């Protein structure tokens, strides 16, 4: 930690030196300002980046939070960002993804981590777009539970054929039903992390091999 | 003869015995919040003529029997110019005669011929709406149509601002619900079943012909009575500001039409006048004399960047919570079915409460812009930011003795539209993970470029002998002195903002700090708008040369800064217009 | 002081065409013996090694060893500007790699060198039990054949044949070639098709490719100039099938 | 058991290039007489018929009739992989059409057959009063000429000339060709330019095209192999102009 | 009445290829002496002048002067349809420019003329102190060389050499050519690379380009037909650098 502070101190003193030099040559009223120091960061394109300041992640345009993500997607994304930004290890990020994908495939994830929360904002009969949360809410109604405008529906996507919407079940009814690994891997975990990984140079193919469970090895094992 | 004080809410003019009379609508906030209409008969409209031959011009103008001629020394894009100030008897004379004046052999051009009379008054008197005015006057009997609690005062002395801004304004929001079982609401056949009203005056209610078991519902006999009750509330409460959401294009036109069909009287104006809806470009604008009507929908479109601007969406964005939503095309079913109607009542009340909350949050900034730009809140809330900046400059031009350029002709406008200045410098980010990243930003890059390089249409020159700042890439030359008009104005704005921020730091009063913060925010918005105006096709001070020079210098400064940063060991990984991120490489 | 002249720019172009699709930046080591480059791609899947001996060049001077870091994309842009009859001259100055083409006109390009910490990778130590040669063009054709059905390719070698194959959702493809070499131990491994495509951009380096293959081991592909004065080789990590 | 061998893969390629731009899936009927295909595009505007006789093939075995349904896009991907000197061998197994190219290497492709109900369309019975021949390339050029101004083309034939023309917003185009044939009854009709483009992809099938034309009738375009061992023909519905 | 015939359509095509990338619409002046065109691009950066003398044409009739306004994009679409051995015939009728290609078939195109007020620009009066000739292809190559590093190009000429150069963020490029002409006063100026690219599309007009250059003055580029019967020239405004 003291080593880290030393680097930061050196950089910040150089920042001070640089700003003093540059501002002494700028016209009156114009000033270049120091806006922040970040231990690590990556940029995807303009207006899309993530930086870490202490243990706080500053992110822009990366769709880091979507209300229909399950806890396992949010947690994995958070861990991936920390592996990259705090630990400086994209390789560790890949291992995190591989490990989560493996647990999902083995049926090794608790239901609480797979629950998707969505709020019902209108009468169920008024939804034109019948999404999974609407199907799950209707199933709750059929079971006698009260569902009205403002209710939070908690559902999971179970195994089976057919559209995802049709496989949305209230979590209260899902005990014993198997969740759909492909849905949680592709639509939740990989959706949450793939943009981040691609910004670090991992190709679509690299990410596909992670989610398929088939592994593209690296040469590291052969050195 | 008495001294009067009132917060100026709105302004217009009427004609009495062929004389234009400026009407100032205000409330005595220091006293009993009494509404006052002040009449000022002393003001006359005028325009400027730029002569080719001064004496010949005066001679030709004499023959037109104008009210008054006066030679003045002014500046036209910085150059000293003798102009003739031509005063008219009545504002309606201006459009009739100005073309004849322009066509005179001895007249090179006419200026400031299209400034509305009431705006001219605000500019020349240096008063601004939503500030307290003081003047001497004589109270006279109000005309019979004026509502009984409104006092009418004839101004006898000078009208001036006390410098005190209005706070704690009375706000009332309203919203109508229509029963339309067959498609889009049609005022010819679909009735209004509810009008909700809510405000900071301790009033939250839904007026309807049903719902008497609900404590917030006020029951009336029929739709006509519903409309008249709404009018009664507005007249009785006399809010300073009446707000709606999409009320310019829907609620007020609908109410007006239904009232006409039903024979209901809707004389909401302080002077007994009716609701009046005018066309403004592609939109409508609905005015009520004395009560400032603000439609929050266009305000929110300007203020926020959202995918949709429904009331529900805006409310969620501002307050982080969802409000009640019902499907608009099926509201009539809620009205027709007893078991659903209560929900409709709650929805209607929720609409006006939400509208009021939005108003409380967003109006302070608009009030501050009203004071800055100096035009009525009714107009400011419907103006694009570029228009706000332009009217601000018109006011400043008067103070500086600078002639206001004319708006572009249709052909000028068309040829300008195709051109666009090159934007800021962007260095595409380097992919991958970077360590030890430093972020640098220029503070007010473009405004300070305008000021430091004296970028203005009046300083732009072809003169190779002048001492000039020369723009990179394009080679445009801007004289180093004197200070250009726009740079001077922006400089004032930035200085004032710094002063206010210092004052904020020194204040212990939370309310004062809040007020000062809104003020500096308004100045910031105005300054940010100002540097873009050179590129607006319709702008009076449009100058593609100035717009291109600003961004060219912007690119030059950030590129040079990045290069210097390299010498200090900072490698830029991403840059965008006025800032960059760099890693330190020692 | 470094200076190297060559009558034929194609060698440089074909080498760096492959290298630039694998790595963004490389360190080139200049010495009296010649020009050398070792690089590992960002994801550590492909390793590339290039060696161009001093004898390859018509004129070669390097009086003290030097390491230069170059952006491969910029380098390729310049090399693509060479004409068939141009003489190409490489040199360095403070901060630039200089490439000059002498033909009808003298065209000089300076590429900014990159100031980065660069740790040269060492090649992994791998023992292979078999080695065989295939025409380079056949390898390229096999990749294009398999590309229509799959994004991965299985390479197999047995005592008689080298086989490239793939199975996809819409079809299968298989290419068999009689290699006529001694293979002691049959081998089979799966590789990413995209990664192999990157390697096979070096098609003017040599007419044949030497392949070393082992069960689930990296693919080693070696291109040697007929004159022995240059060598370009690649290592590609295998794809490991999931346990079922 | 079905097996067909051919020294020249181009015939297959050029035929299916046109067919695949007209229909996504086709049923191919395999019999002792040869290979036959009839297909109607999704919007029922273009009809295509292909016949390749057993005699066309160097070796042809089909001991019992068979119908296979093939995705034309996948088939084209494979046929494009043929080399000039490859010998091509077609066969079927349970669930696949197998295409093998024998050259320097043996390259085997299996295309999944589609399991669908398929009703073979019958060609409409149309009597034409005239028939003439034009060079295939001239037809292609006419389409490209008209393409710059219009998306539809008018074909006319009279006793001396075949004329292709169009009028557009920015200009007009007209191509006249002296056909030197007997035309009993002049004819005129309008067709979609895009649809004709699809048909004209079969440009290696024959050097000339036989055209049958009638007033507001479908265009019939027939390509016959010089050897008579194969025929590819199209019917294209006219565009009917609205009554003015 | 206007009619002009030419055995070689390439002259027209190469001229208008350059012109159409500079201006959207041109006015062509037809007279007994020939065909003439002067145009200034929308942003007033590039001026183009074309002159094709009556003698250039195999047959030329213009019994009274005429001015036609043509959309250059539409004109280019038609000219691109010419074949190598076509004879091209230009004429006008009420509202159209007619272009006919006679070859295996007769192909007639009518391009709508534009009804606009058009003020023909006059060329600026510029005195140059020097003039030299360079191979056209060398100029094109220089542009492509500089394009990899910069979007602007510096042209310099001194007593021995013509030099094209640029400095970019990632590298520099410089092309030197010994012109072997008398240059009284060295000159240097900077131009937009994109604008020069537009001019250099006329590469079949002449094998060499005549260049006039002056310090921070417009570039004048002139292409003369070997037969003297046609001339195509351009003026390009310089880019002015800011004082440092
Ligand atoms: Mg509403
Ligand atoms: Mg409502």
Swiss-Prot record, chain A:
Keyword Hydrolase in annotation: yes
GO-annotated biological processes: DNA-templated DNA replication
Activity regulation remarks: DNA polymerase is inhibited by replication protein A (RPA), while 3'-5' exonuclease activity is not. Polymerase inhibition can be overcome by replication factor C (RFC) and PCNA.
Catalytic activity, reaction form: DNA(n) + a 2'-deoxyribonucleoside 5'-triphosphate = DNA(n+1) + diphosphate
UniProt keywords, alphabetically: DNA replication, DNA-binding, DNA-directed DNA polymerase, Exonuclease, Hydrolase, Nuclease, Nucleotidyltransferase, Transferase
A GO MF term: DNA binding
Alphabetical list of Gene3D superfamilies matching this protein: DNA polymerase family B, C-terminal domain, Palm domain of DNA polymerase
Chain segments annotated as coiled-coil in the UniProt record: none
Enzyme class: transferase
EC number(s) reported in the record: 2.7.7.7
Comment on activity versus temperature: Optimum temperature for DNA polymerase is 60 degrees Celsius, functional between 60 and 80 degrees Celsius. Exonuclease activity is higher at 70 than 50 degrees Celsius.
Other observations noted: In some Methanobacteriaceae the PolB protein is split over 2 genes.
Subunit structure: Formed of a complex between PolB1 and PolB2; the exonuclease activity is associated with subunit 1. Probably binds replication protein A (RPA).
Function summary: In addition to polymerase activity, this DNA polymerase exhibits 3'-5' exonuclease activity.
The protein, known as: DNA polymerase PolB subunit 2
Swiss-Prot record, chain B:
Catalysed reaction equations from the record: DNA(n) + a 2'-deoxyribonucleoside 5'-triphosphate = DNA(n+1) + diphosphate
Its EC number(s): 2.7.7.7
Molecular function per GO: DNA binding; DNA-directed DNA polymerase activity; exonuclease activity; nucleotide binding
Temperature dependence as stated in the record: Optimum temperature for DNA polymerase is 60 degrees Celsius, functional between 60 and 80 degrees Celsius. Exonuclease activity is higher at 70 than 50 degrees Celsius.
Activity regulation (record text): DNA polymerase is inhibited by replication protein A (RPA), while 3'-5' exonuclease activity is not. Polymerase inhibition can be overcome by replication factor C (RFC) and PCNA.
SUPFAM superfamilies, A to Z: DNA/RNA polymerases, Ribonuclease H-like
GO annotation terms (biological process): DNA-templated DNA replication
Cross-referenced Gene3D superfamilies: DNA Polymerase, chain B, domain 1, Helix hairpin bin, Palm domain of DNA polymerase, Ribonuclease H-like superfamily/Ribonuclease H
Swiss-Prot/TrEMBL keywords: DNA replication, DNA-binding, DNA-directed DNA polymerase, Exonuclease, Hydrolase, Nuclease, Nucleotidyltransferase, Transferase
One Pfam family, short name: DNA_pol_B_exo1
Family: Belongs to the DNA polymerase type-B family.
PANTHER family, A to Z: DNA POLYMERASE CATALYTIC SUBUNIT, DNA POLYMERASE DELTA CATALYTIC SUBUNIT
Record note on quaternary structure: Formed of a complex between PolB1 and PolB2; the exonuclease activity is associated with subunit 1. Probably binds replication protein A (RPA).
Function: In addition to polymerase activity, this DNA polymerase exhibits 3'-5' exonuclease activity.
Protein name: DNA polymerase PolB subunit 1
Provenance organism: Methanothermobacter thermautotrophicus (strain ATCC 29096 / DSM 1053 / JCM 10044 / NBRC 100330 / Delta H) (Methanobacterium thermoautotrophicum)
Lineage: Archaea, Methanobacteriati, Methanobacteriota, Methanomada group, Methanobacteria
Swiss-Prot record, chains C, D, E:
Record keyword DNA-binding present: yes
The entry's keywords: DNA replication, DNA-binding
Keyword DNA-binding: yes
Any Pfam family: PCNA_N
Quaternary data: Homotrimer. The subunits circularize to form a toroid; DNA passes through its center. Replication factor C (RFC) is required to load the toroid on the DNA.
Described purpose of this protein according to its UniProt entry: Sliding clamp subunit that acts as a moving platform for DNA processing. Responsible for tethering the catalytic subunit of DNA polymerase to DNA during high-speed replication. In conjunction with replication factor C (RFC) stimulates DNA synthesis by PolB, relieving inhibition by replication protein A (RPA).
Protein name: DNA polymerase sliding clamp
Species, as recorded: Methanothermobacter thermautotrophicus (strain ATCC 29096 / DSM 1053 / JCM 10044 / NBRC 100330 / Delta H)
């Amino acid at each position: 930690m003291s080593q880290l502070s030393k680097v930061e101190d050196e950089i910040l003193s150089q920042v001070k030196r640089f700003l003093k030099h540059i501002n002494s040559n700028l016209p009156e009223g114009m000033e270049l300002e120091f806006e922040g120091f970040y231990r690590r960061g990556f940029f995807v394109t303009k207006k899309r980046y993530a930086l870490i300041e202490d243990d706080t992640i500053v992110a822009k345009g990366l769709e880091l939070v979507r209300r229909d993500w399950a806890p396992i997607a949010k947690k994995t994304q958070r861990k991936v960002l920390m592996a990259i930004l705090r630990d400086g290890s994209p390789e560790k990020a890949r291992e995190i993804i591989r490990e989560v994908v493996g647990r999902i495939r083995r049926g090794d994830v608790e239901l609480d981590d797979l629950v998707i929360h969505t709020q019902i904002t209108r009468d169920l009969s008024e939804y034109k777009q019948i999404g999974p949360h609407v199907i799950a809410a209707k199933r709750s109604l059929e079971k006698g539970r009260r569902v009205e405008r403002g209710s939070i529906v908690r559902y999971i996507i179970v195994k089976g054929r057919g559209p995802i919407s049709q496989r949305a079940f209230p979590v209260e009814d899902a005990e014993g039903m198997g969740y759909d690994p492909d849905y949680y891997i592709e639509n939740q975990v990989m959706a949450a992390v793939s943009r981040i990984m691609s910004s670090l140079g991992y190709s679509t193919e690299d990410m596909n091999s992670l989610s398929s469970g088939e592994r593209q090895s690296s040469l590291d094992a052969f050195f | 003869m008495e001294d009067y004080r009132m917060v100026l809410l709105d302004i217009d003019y009427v004609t009495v015995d062929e004389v234009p009379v400026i009407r100032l609508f205000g409330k005595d906030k220091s006293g009993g919040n009494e509404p006052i209409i002040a009449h000022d008969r002393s003001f006359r409209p005028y325009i400027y003529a730029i002569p080719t031959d001064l004496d010949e011009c005066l001679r030709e103008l004499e023959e037109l029997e104008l009210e008054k001629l006066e030679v003045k020394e002014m500046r036209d894009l910085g150059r000293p110019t003798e102009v003739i100030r031509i005063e008219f008897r009545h504002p309606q004379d201006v459009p009739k005669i100005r073309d004849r004046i322009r066509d005179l052999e001895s007249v090179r051009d006419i200026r400031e011929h299209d400034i509305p009379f009431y705006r001219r008054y605000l500019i020349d008197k240096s008063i601004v709406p939503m500030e307290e005015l003081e003047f001497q006057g004589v109270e006279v009997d109000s005309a019979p149509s004026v509502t009984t609690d409104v006092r009418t005062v004839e101004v006898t002395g000078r009208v001036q601002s006390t410098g005190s801004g209005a706070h704690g304004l009375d706000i009332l929001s309203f919203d109508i619900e229509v029963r339309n079982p067959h498609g889009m609401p049609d005022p010819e056949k679909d009735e209004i079943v509810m009008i909700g009203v809510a405000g900071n005056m301790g009033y939250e209610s839904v007026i309807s012909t049903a719902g008497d078991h609900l404590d917030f519902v006020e029951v009336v006999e029929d739709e006509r009575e519903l409309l008249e009750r709404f009018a009664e509330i507005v007249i009785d409460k006399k809010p300073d500001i009446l707000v709606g959401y999409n009320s310019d294009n829907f609620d007020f036109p609908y109410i007006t039409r239904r009232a006409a069909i039903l024979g209901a009287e809707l004389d909401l104006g302080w002077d007994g006048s009716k609701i009046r809806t005018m066309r403004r470009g592609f939109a409508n604008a609905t005015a009520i004399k004395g009560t400032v009507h603000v439609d929050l929908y266009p305000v929110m479109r300007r203020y926020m960047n959202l995918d949709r601007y429904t009331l529900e969406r805006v409310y969620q964005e501002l307050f982080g919570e969802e409000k009640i939503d019902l499907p608009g095309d099926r509201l009539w079913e809620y009205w027709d079915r007893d078991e659903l109607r209560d929900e409709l009542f709650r929805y209607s009340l929720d609409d006006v409460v939400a509208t009021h909350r939005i108003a409380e949050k967003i109006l302070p900034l608009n009030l501050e812009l009203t004071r800055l730009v100096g035009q009525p809140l009714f107009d400011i809330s419907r103006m694009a930011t570029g228009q706000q900046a332009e009217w601000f400059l018109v006011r400043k031009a008067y103070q500086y003795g600078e002639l206001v350029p004319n708006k572009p002709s249709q052909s000028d406008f068309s040829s300008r539209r195709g051109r666009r200045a090159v934007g800021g410098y962007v260095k595409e980010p380097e992919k991958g993970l970077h360590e030890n990243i430093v972020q640098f930003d220029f503070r007010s890059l473009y405004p300070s470029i305008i000021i430091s390089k004296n970028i203005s249409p009046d300083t732009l020159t072809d003169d190779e002998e002048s001492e000039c700042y020369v723009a990179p890439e394009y080679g445009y030359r801007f004289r180093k002195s004197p200070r250009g008009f726009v740079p001077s104005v922006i400089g004032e704005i930035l200085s004032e903002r710094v002063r206010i921020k210092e004052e904020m730091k020194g204040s212990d009063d939370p309310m004062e700090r809040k007020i000062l913060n809104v003020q500096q925010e308004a100045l910031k918005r105005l300054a940010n708008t100002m540097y873009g105006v050179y590129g607006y096709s319709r702008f009076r001070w449009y100058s593609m040369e100035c717009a291109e020079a600003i961004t060219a210098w912007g690119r030059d400064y950030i590129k040079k800064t990045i290069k210097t940063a390299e010498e200090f060991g900072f490698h830029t990984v991403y840059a965008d217009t006025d800032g960059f991120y760099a890693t330190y490489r020692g | 002081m470094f200076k190297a002249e060559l009558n034929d720019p194609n060698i440089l172009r074909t080498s760096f065409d492959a290298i630039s699709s694998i790595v963004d930046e490389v360190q080139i080591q200049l010495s009296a013996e010649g020009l050398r480059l070792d690089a590992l791609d960002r994801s550590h899947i492909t390793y590339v090694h290039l060696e161009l001996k001093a004898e390859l060049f018509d004129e070669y001077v390097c009086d003290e060893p030097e390491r230069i870091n170059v952006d491969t994309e910029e380098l390729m842009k310049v090399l693509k500007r060479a004409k068939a009859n141009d003489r190409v001259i490489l040199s360095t100055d403070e901060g630039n790699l200089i490439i000059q083409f002498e033909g009808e006109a003298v065209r000089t390009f300076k590429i900014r060198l990159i100031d980065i910490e660069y740790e040269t990778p060492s090649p992994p130590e791998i023992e292979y039990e078999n080695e065989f040669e295939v025409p380079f063009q056949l390898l390229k054709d096999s990749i294009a054949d398999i590309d229509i059905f799959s994004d991965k390719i299985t390479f197999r070698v047995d005592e008689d044949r080298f086989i490239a194959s793939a199975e996809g959702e819409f079809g299968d493809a298989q290419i068999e070639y009689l290699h006529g070499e001694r293979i002691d131990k049959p081998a089979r491994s799966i590789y990413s098709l995209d990664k192999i495509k990157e390697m096979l951009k070096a098609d003017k380096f040599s007419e044949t490719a030497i392949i070393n293959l082992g069960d689930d081991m990296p693919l080693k592909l070696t291109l040697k100039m007929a004159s022995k004065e240059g060598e370009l080789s690649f290592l590609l990590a295998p794809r490991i099938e999931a346990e079922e």
